[in-house]
Amino acid sequence: AAVAGGIPAVKTLREGLAGNEMTRLAGILNGTCNYILTTMEQTGQDFADVLAEAQHLGYAEAEPSFDVDGIDAAHKLTILAAIAFGQKPDFAAALVQGIRDVSAVDFTFANQLGFRIKLVGVAAPGQVPRMQTCLLPLSSQLAKVNGVLNAVEFYGEPVGSVLAIGPGAGGGATSS
């Protein structure tokens, strides 16, 4: 699964939503990062400890930079944007920020304000794709996607919003 683990994201764009004009994509596209952020929020542990746990569980690579620096997720976003909007993939143009700088105290403040911290990618026609750490309202569908799950929210005309959620880290999800 090159994009979004166990979610058939490419097939959804090419077949399921082919009759729509896609206007935006948003998603959690790296299960490793989502696992780390979810665990930090739920346990209060710091980044390094949760990363080590993710490596032990097989969710993170021994050299995790590609994941935790947002590069893997940005590549996936760029591929989806190219398919959705009929544009040439241009990873170099994407704005990319990972999760290394998120601290345990950030979750305390986010929760007090009614938000959840997630690594989210957003793309729209004619705009620079962005993969960055975001504050999402707790009521947001993407804010409710936890653990190793990935999610892609497709926006199109006439369909509106379609959300797909599935496993995004670990051998089973990434080999499907």
Model-derived segments and their meaning:
Residues 27, 41, 68, 97, ...:
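A short glycine-/small-residue-rich loop at the edge of a beta-strand within enzyme catalytic domains
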Residues 50-144, 149-151:
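Substrate-binding/catalytic subdomain of NAD(P)-dependent oxidoreductase enzymes
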Residues 24, 36, 118-119, 130, ...:
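Structured core elements
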Residues 23, 61-69, 164-169:
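A short glycine-threonine-serine/GTX helix/turn-capping micro-motif
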Residues 139-176:
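ATP-dependent carboxylate/acyl-activation modules
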Residues 19-25, 126-127, 149-150, 158-161:
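Short coil/turn connectors at secondary-structure junctions
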Residues 27-30, 132, 155:
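Short beta-strand segments
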Residues 2-60, 71-72, 79:
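Rossmann-like NAD(P)H-binding beta-loop-alpha module
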